[in-house]
């Protein structure tokens, strides 16, 4: 069982835009940051529920497929679930739709816990107010021996890295520069301990 982080970052190391609104929950630059990932066959099948077989393949699709492999539980922040879009609506079910791509228990970190939400495809959102170590222990119990993914956003990833709780970083680097956004790494808080890394790339024709 490994604790994994799978995310897309820009060339200057940013993983999240900072201009999210209720009407544009991902932010203006999110499409640029995740363009290669969102164009893959795996993303279209798993997230958009598109059975056509369309979408890119090769290294980008391998990255996207690896995102979902072997996951038994997920941990994410309230923003990634979408709580800030409708914070006062107890019936708000997030912006992932009726069939979220996770299909496993998802622990949502929030200072305002609410009852769990069960979705039709096996996804269960569980809202907790807990430290990284404590929610990770709950996720381990729910994961059934499979891996646990720290899904984001950037501040949640940063907290788990600072606590030295991450075993694997699985990163797709987009060829863009975002400037001042949100970094997933601790920055001035101290170094991140690394274990092993491999690199694959896709060149641009010409």
Question: Where do the protein language model's features map onto the residues?
Answer:
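Enzymes that bind and transform nitrogen-containing heteroaromatic metabolites
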Residues: 1-206
């Amino acid at each position: 069982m490994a604790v994994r982080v799978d995310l897309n970052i820009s060339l200057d190391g940013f993983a999240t835009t900072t201009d999210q609104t209720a009407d544009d929950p991902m932010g203006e630059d999110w499409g640029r940051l995740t363009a290669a990932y969102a164009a893959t066959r795996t993303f279209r099948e798993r997230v958009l529920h598109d059975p056509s077989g369309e979408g890119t393949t090769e290294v980008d699709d391998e990255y996207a497929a690896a995102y979902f492999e072997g996951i038994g539980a997920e941990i994410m922040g309230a923003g990634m679930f979408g709580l800030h879009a409708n914070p006062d609506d107890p019936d708000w079910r997030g912006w992932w739709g009726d069939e979220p791509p996770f299909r496993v228990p998802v622990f949502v970190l929030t200072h305002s816990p609410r009852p769990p939400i069960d979705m039709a495809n096996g996804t269960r959102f569980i809202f907790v107010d807990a430290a990284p170590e404590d929610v990770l222990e709950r996720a381990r119990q729910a994961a059934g021996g499979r891996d646990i993914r720290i899904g984001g956003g950037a501040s949640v990833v940063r907290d788990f890295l600072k606590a030295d709780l991450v075993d694997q970083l699985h990163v797709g680097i987009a060829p863009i520069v975002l400037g001042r956004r949100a970094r997933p790494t601790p920055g001035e808080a101290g170094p991140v301990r690394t274990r092993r890394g491999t690199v694959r790339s896709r060149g641009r024709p010409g």
